[in-house]
Every structure is written in C-alpha cells, then in structure tokens.
Amino acid sequence: MSIRAPPRLLELARQRLLRDQALAISTMEELPRELFPTLFMEAFSRRRCETLKTMVQAWPFTRLPLGSLMKSPHLESLKSVLEGVDVLLTQEVRPRQSKLQVLDLRNVDENFCDIFSGATASFPEALSQKQTADNCPGTGRQQPFMVFIDLCLKNRTLDECLTHLLEWGKQRKGLLHVCCKELQVFGMPIHSIIEVLNMVELDCIQEVEVCCPWELSTLVKFAPYLGQMRNLRKLVLFNIRASACIPPDNKGQFIARFTSQFLKLDYFQNLSMHSVSFLEGHLDQLLRCLQASLEMVVMTDCLLSESDLKHLSWCPSIRQLKELDLRGVTLTHFSPEPLTGLLEQVVATLQTLDLEDCGIMDSQLSAILPVLSRCSQLSTFSFCGNLISMAALENLLRHTVGLSKLSLELYPAPLESYDTQGALCWGRFAELGAELMNTLRDLRQPKIIVFCTVPCPRCGIRASYDLEPSHCLC
C-alpha cells in the first residue's frame, strides 16, 4: 500500500489563505514570492476580488501575465486587477516587495505558474524590460506603467472586458500606456472597428491582419487609421475586392486614398495579400508610396497584370527581399521578362520563392533558369502545379546544383505523367519520379524534395513522390 506524501508547508499555507480572504489580505506583504503565482491563479479562478486587488499591489515580479488566465474572461475579476493597478499608480511609496511594471493581457500559450517556476523564474523581469524598452515606440524615453494587449475583433460587438479595459486605459492616459502590437479583424462591422481604433495608441501597432471579405469602399474607411500606425511592419489582407458598380474614376480615387497611407509608414517591411483583386493594373500606385525596403512580398491568388509584375521588378524597395510568394497568380500568358527582372533584383537576398500554381510553361521556365541558379541564399523553392515537361524539369534540377542552402524543394509532376484527358497515370508518374530523383542524386544530395501532381478533382489532395510514391485520398 502506497503512503501519500504530506502536503508541503507552502501548499498548506496556500490552502489556508484561499479559505480565509481576510487573512490573505492582511498578510500579503509578508508572503514569500513563491506563493504568489499559484495563489493568484486560484484567486482569479475563484473570483476572490479583494484578494486579487491586494495581490496586484504587492506583486513581487515586474510582469503579471494575466492573458494566460483570460481564456474565459470575467469582468469583475479584471476590474479587481485594474483597481489594484489604480492604487499603485496613485501611491507615492509602493509596498516593500511590489515590483509590478507590466500587465500583460495578451493571449499566449503559456501556463501561468510555469512562467515563474524553475529556470524561468527571472523570465518575467527580462521579458518586461525588453518589451517596454525595445518594442513599444509610443512611450518615449520615460517608461510608464505598461499594459500589453492584442486586439482580435471577431464578433459584431466588442466584449465587455475589452471595452472596460480600453475605456479604463483612455481615462488614465499619462499615468500608464496601453500597448497593442497586433490587430486582427475577422468580422466586426467597420463602424465598431473605428470605435475601437479611436481608443488605441495607433503608434504601437506593428502588425495588422484583415481576414474578412471587404469591399474596397470599406478598406478606404479603414485606411486613415492605417496611416496613423507609423510603426507598422506587416499588413495582411484577405478577400478585398472592388465592386463592379464603382465607376472607374471613383475606383482610382479609392485606390489612391489607400495607397497614399504607405507614405507615412517608414518601417513597413512585409506586404501580404490573398485573393485581392482591386490592385490589378494599379500596383504601381502602392509601390511608389513605399518608404522602406521590403523583406516579404506575398500576393497569393491575386489578380495581377503583366504591367504590375514589371512595376514590381522596377521597385527600389524590393532589393532586400527575403521572401517572394506569387502562389496562384496566373502567369501563363505573361512574357518571362518581368519575372526574370524581378528575380534579378533579389538574387543576393532571396530565401523563399513560391511560384506554385502559376501556370508557368517550359519556355518561361527556361528564361528564368539562369537568374534562378544565382539565388545563392535560396532555402525554400515551391514550383509545383506548373505545366512542365520531363526535359524541362531535368534542366531545372541541373540549374539548382549551386544552390547549397536549398532545404525544401517542391516540384510539379512532369506533363508526361498525365494522359491526353489530363488524368494522372499513376504508374508513369512513379516511374518518372524515380528517374528525376536519381538525376538529382547524381548532381547533389537533396534534403527534402517532393514531386507533386495537380490536386485530385475528387478529393483536392495532390499525389506526391519523394522517396516513394504517395497517393491522394481517393
């Protein structure tokens, strides 16, 4: 029969303090710091509001990572924490062990108690110093009390906890700084989004992601706020289109009002657009407004004209580009010169190139091979889904011999793998895949390489060949 170990003294003390809220409050300044994380977590989950308020005032770490406890937010518990912060802000002399400088409400995948345990015990201090000093440009030289949040707007209305927090922060401007680095929009009406943005320090926002289908006219209402995010590094847009009802003159004005905001973004580095159609024939307007060198250009399933690609290749801001993703942009009828010129501009820096499902033909591939073979930093190359013959694929593999940093390569199944109706001939694909793999091994030793078919018309999955063939789901 096993004998159960008796509870540690710290555990017994914690249990007693949770049962007796008055005792917990009266002895707070004498508690060992080891008790604070577990006691706070229990008090928060049990909604012991007075205990929470007192614990915040005596918190012995510089950072309180409340976001990890806010999976199911409770307004009264949040109010108690903020009331504790209010007391700290008005105190001339803090309690002896109080060190709190950062209230972190971001939704992170951290266990609250693990943050303070073992080797990571000093982590909250180190992290808070880095965040306040390096990552929040809106605070100036003197660092006030910091409140970190991420905004994820996915409901039609703002939840009561976030509403209370933003209003609380706005009323205490000058005493503390509410910093939001990431803004995600999934479905909130534009008038509600604007209401939120009017309560946020826009200077702090570094990443914006709009994941809902907007008309161009809606994007234009959002644009002035984008221009005020002067430290914006990354913008991600999904499913933005211009209604066919918009007259051409109005469309041009709308595009100008959007693109002109980039003139104010001195630190902008990452442009990511997915299923965006309104810039077709107008990409040059955006490119002319860029103020800094881009590190990433992602334009997947977008409508682009050949002139758009030319203007991209001429843009001075792409010369330090590390990632270029044109997946799903139809290039079948384009001259190869714009893509060749584009690769020429980034040959010294490009690390990731995705030309998947671009409809590239043998002649276009042949034209870009000389410059592709000089992309010495290339580590990831995705080219599957293009209409390439066996001979052209073998030529492509020969041109990758000097690309020593390649670690992931995705290539299309040769055209000869399909019958005249476009159906995959499985045996032929496996045979040609083995030949291509042998050809490559004669040239160099690949790390990860896969030859992929077009998606199956029934299940949507690509069959593949790496070390051996792999079927789709059918």
From Swiss-Prot:
Keywords: Leucine-rich repeat, Repeat
An MF annotation (GO) of this entry: ubiquitin-like ligase-substrate adaptor activity
Keyword Ligase listed: no
LRR repeats: 97-122, 177-201, 202-228, 229-264, 265-290, 291-322, 323-341, 347-374, 375-399
KW Repeat (keyword) present: yes
InterPro entries listed in its UniProt record: LRR_dom_sf, PRAME, PRAME_domain
GO BP annotation list: negative regulation of apoptotic process; negative regulation of cell differentiation; negative regulation of DNA-templated transcription; positive regulation of cell population proliferation; proteasome-mediated ubiquitin-dependent protein catabolic process
Signal peptide: none
A GO cellular-component term linked to this record: Cul2-RING ubiquitin ligase complex
UniProt record similarity statement: Belongs to the PRAME family.
PANTHER family: PRAME FAMILY MEMBER 7-RELATED, SIMILAR TO PREFERENTIALLY EXPRESSED ANTIGEN IN MELANOMA-LIKE 3
Designated name of the protein: PRAME family member 8
Source organism of the structure: Homo sapiens (Human)
